[in-house]
Amino acid sequence: MKRNTEELKEKLISVGIEEIRTNGIDRMSMRTIAQKCGVTHGAPYKHFGSKDRYIQVVMEHLSMFFLKNMIQGIDTSIDARTQLILMGCNFVRFAQEETYLFEVLFIKFPYNYMELSHETISVNSSLPGFEHFKSVALRLKDEENLSSSDAEILIHFWSFIAGLALLVRSPVGESFKENDVQKTVRTMLDIYIKGDS
């Protein structure tokens, strides 16, 4: 019985991810997800307690999917600056290719699970994509002897790359090529590092 329960829970998560991926979070329905899993509409609530908790679990899985996309093709032993440039390009590509997932991860829900203080940004949920980005950004801080606080560095870098991704996926950014994205991220990091050192 426990195995069937875990299998159903995983199926509910994967069907929810596919629903978000194809239709967006605004059109996601717990009833539709239950129906696609062949269970009653109350089953998701039995396993997750509430729609909010279900979305939080789905967000954790989506963040892992985002992490895999963000670090794809990147050697983690290279310097943090180069990693951030490559991660930035992957981030923008993700925004273009996975529009609904980008929307749910970076526009609709991320700040429900993050806390900002004067010192840093912390998460109160498992968001491996953000946690990896944070670790590389803070590694850059150490490698370049940057004097800004952790929170300032994270806010500046995260808001820049998220903003760039929004621009590139809009009609304004249709002419942006991957080379342009890489050059833009590299230039931003150069300006930031030279201005902060």
Predicted region positions:
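Amphipathic alpha-helical segments used for helix-helix packing
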Residues: 97-117, 166-174
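Short hydrophobic/aromatic patch on the recognition helix
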Residues: 38-48
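Basic, helix-initiating cap at the start of DNA-binding domains
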Residues: 1-23, 27, 31-32, 36, ...
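Hydrophobic/aromatic residues within well-ordered alpha-helical segments
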Residues: 51, 58, 62, 66, ...
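Short hydrophobic clusters on alpha-helical segments that form packing/core surfaces
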Residues: 12-20, 62, 66, 70, ...
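Amphipathic alpha-helical packing segments from all-alpha helical-bundle domains
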Residues: 70-71, 75, 116-142, 151-155, ...
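Hydrophobic alpha-helical connector segments
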Residues: 57, 71-100, 153-157
